[in-house]
């Protein structure tokens, strides 16, 4: 089980990303727009750099929803590989079967 503080940090990052998503998209559109003046695009770049670091979605880490494990997490299920294995053996994930060939 991951430390609760790390899980809460990720939750805080997710809220920050959600809060600044529209503003980041607006500034990025200004920066990418070639028809705008260089000064205007430069100002938009400075404003984008002034936003909090955690406002960038790239800083988010996928974690297991049960244990908080940061590695070996499957996006489809939102669970760590070890928990997927346990739950799948109990038959609680519909359509998931053990591979055999």
Curated annotation (Swiss-Prot):
Name the record gives this protein: Small ribosomal subunit protein uS14
Family named by the database record: Belongs to the universal ribosomal protein uS14 family.
A Pfam family reported for this protein in Swiss-Prot or TrEMBL: Ribosomal_S14
GO molecular function, one term: rRNA binding
Gene expressing this chain: rpsN
Keyword annotations from UniProtKB, A to Z: Ribonucleoprotein, Ribosomal protein, RNA-binding, rRNA-binding
Keyword Ribonucleoprotein: yes
Organism: Polynucleobacter necessarius subsp. necessarius (strain STIR1)
RNA-binding among keywords: yes
Primary role: Binds 16S rRNA, required for the assembly of 30S particles and may also be responsible for determining the conformation of the 16S rRNA at the A site.
Record note on quaternary structure: Part of the 30S ribosomal subunit. Contacts proteins S3 and S10.
Alphabetical GO biological process terms: translation
GO cellular component: cytoplasm; small ribosomal subunit
